[in-house]
Amino acid sequence: MKIRSRFEEMQSELVPVSMSETEHIASISSDATTEKTSELRDDSCISVSGDESSRLETGAELLSLDSDRILCQTNEHCSQIEVQESHIPDCGSGENSCANTDTCPEDSGQIDDFPGGDFTEQVSKTKEPEQTVTQILAELKSSAPAEAANPKTASASLYDTDCTRKLISEMKTVSASDDLLGEIESELLSAEFAEGHQVPNGLNKGEQALALFEKCVHSRYLQQELTVKQLIKENKNHQELILNICSEKDSLREELRKRTETEKQHMNTIKQLELRIEELNKEIKASKDQLVAQDVTAKNAIQQIHKEMAQRMDQANKKCEEARQEKEAMVMKYVRGEKEALDLRKEKETLERKLRDASKELEKNTNKIKQLSQEKGRLQQLYESKEGETTRLIREIEKLKEEMNSQVIKVKWAQNKLKAEMDSHKETKDKLKETTTKLTQAKEEAEQIRQNCQDMIKTYQESEEIKSNELDAKLRVTKGELEKQMQEKSDQLEMHHAKIKELEDLKRTFKEGMDELRTLRTKAKCLEDERLRTEDELSKYREIINRQKSEIQNLLDKVKITDQLHEQLQSGKQEIEHLKEEMESLNSLINDLQKDIEGSRKRESELLLFTEKLTSKNAQLQSESSALQSQVDNLSCTESQLQSQCQQMGQANRNLESKLLKEEELRKEEVQTLQAELSAAQTEVKALSTQVEELKDELVTQRRKHASNVKDLSKQLQQARRKLEQTENGNHDKDISSMGSRSSSSGSLNARISAEDRSPENTSSSVAVDNFPEVDKAMLIERIVRLQKAHARKNEKIEFMEDHIKQLVEEIRKKTKIIQSYVLREESGTLSSEASDFNKVHLSRRGGIMASLYTSHPADSGLTLELSLEINRKLQAVLEDTLLKNITLKENLQTLGTEIERLIKHQHELEQRTKKA
């Protein structure tokens, strides 16, 4: 009781001292820094108090160990150490950081003798750091107003200077707007340069000048773009340098802050330790006086501790007996659980046997199912193969029918052609007879005219000389008439020769027609033989189909049987699933019981571990006390090292700050110059972009005018051509249609050429405009409107091109039909002559691309697939043109024949009139 009263007196003496220390530290921190730094330092004070409490704990433990040596090392002292350890952390963690000194008097009250030599050494050690502490405080007071004076260095922002902040904000704002403008400009350029250059009234006078002007503008624009890009790159490099400098500056500041905080913490700890040492010296002096009185009280306390220990031992024995009873109960539970586990194992074994039987049955069923499925697959394959054969046979039958029909049609067509040619041959014979009669009549008339002329000449010679002049005039007239008649006779002779040539041609065609008739008759005989064969094959195939139908019915019956077996299998599977569910429920019960058994075992192991932990904790507490003593010695050494390092770092920080300020000023000047250059370049770019847009608009308008003029002129030309064709050829609708097709094809070629001419303009217009710093809503709206108009124009062009493509496709189809009909009419052998065969042989000997066409192997190494395809296309185009020319020539020949007949009739009528006259 006396010891406790003494402890309370010591606590009342120590509390005001600790409060005064905290007030003194708070006053220093408030005078040195701003509000933000004061909050940080208050936190540091709290942390210091925590460190001090740990160090005081170590001091208290040292004192307690000394008292153990003095006293008789009883169990009472160990219990007091445990009480002290439980009290000390609570004092250190509270708001009053210095309240941890309350535990110290208890330790001092138990000390009997303190060695004098150790104490003097400790006092001398504490006097040495007192001088250094005062110096460090003075330096901190001088550095605090300097930090408050320059708020730029104390700022917590990433970018300290106003210039860097402005630059980064401009960079962030410019990037989004520049991206948007770049996208719109690229779309505008691709849309506006798509249309061709159009000049008003269809005249292309200033195209070269405009092209040169566009090239100049484009080159100037590219140069300015390059300069702008270089400036942007330099600006980015400068910004990166500024950011690196700022980051280095911030890192140095953070290091400075941390070091200043650590220095302040060390100063506070040093002050507290000095005060604590003084208090301990006072307490040691008082404790020496009180040691004699404490011997008596200690003996009484030892007796009380013995009594308490006996009571605790009784309580521990009771707890041990209770634990033994619980252990016996747990053993009984364990035995019961094992019995239940054995019963469950037996049940499990029976269920496993049932499961094995069921699995065996399942395997048998699965094997049966596999066999049935294999049979089913085999039958399905047979069925599918038979179906494929039947479909193939049906297709072959249909093909044969189609071939038969086509051959019948060809025979009929050949017969009709023969009849028509025979009729035409008869007509030509009649015409020949008529022409021969006409020729004889013309010869007789000519002889009569000659005789008349001779008579007239004789009469004129016998007449009088007075009428000689008149007769000369009449002679001249008659000579002119004779010359006219002679010309008419020569024309008639030429007509006669032409008719003879036509007769020879008709004879040749008649011979060719007869040859074709013979070949067609032989083909008809062959086709009849093939028809008989196909009928026999059809009968055979029908028999095969009937057999396959019977086989398919058998297979269907087997499939039904397999389906029934499959249903039985599914029912067996369902039963097996029910059994599996029952097995799972039983397994879950077994697992629950096993978990209960494991839980009981774990409880036993936990009780054993608890007893082991109690013994190990006592050993740990003794080892920790010795470790704390060594830590106190190490901390005193590290304090001196840290103070020297703090001084060195302070000097290095000052040098770095001066260098930073110089570099910041240089960078500011460079950034200002770059900004001025950038603004000038941006103004130039804006002016050029406006000029380019105006030129584009002018080009678009001129191209539109040019296109409209060209369309008008093409329409007028077409109308004039139509009028000319109508005047020259009255009834030539087919010629007009062919000319229209050619004009449409030529129009398509022109459209392609114009598209190819415009494509480089589109590619050149796809040069994207670089970033602009500002966005005008009016400009954006105008550009959107222009884009919409361009989109509408493109849609119109697409519709026109689709219509044009449809027309071209229809024309191609018509031409293919004409070509097919022409090829079907005439065989390839009749078209080629002997001269063409000789030419082919000559070409094949010479070698080259044409030689590879007429030989089986390629004669030229340069002949590739692409080249051969191009040659094929060109030849096809030539073939189409020649076919069209041949068709037109035939039609022209027919018209010429009709005109010749008309002229002959007209001549006969004139001759009859002259005879009548």
Swiss-Prot record:
Spans annotated as Disordered: 1-52, 97-118, 701-769
Biased composition (Low complexity): 737-748
Organ and tissue specificity: Expressed in postnatal germ cells.
This protein's record includes keyword Isomerase: no
InterPro entries: CCDC186
GO terms classed as biological process: glucose homeostasis; insulin secretion involved in cellular response to glucose stimulus; response to bacterium; vesicle cytoskeletal trafficking
Comp. bias regions, Basic and acidic residues: 33-44, 722-736
GO cellular component term of the entry, any: Golgi apparatus
Keywords annotated in UniProt: Coiled coil, Phosphoprotein
Coiled-coil region(s): 220-736, 778-822, 874-913
Modified residues (Phosphoserine): S759
Designated name of the protein: Coiled-coil domain-containing protein 186
Species lineage: Eukaryota, Metazoa, Chordata, Craniata, Vertebrata
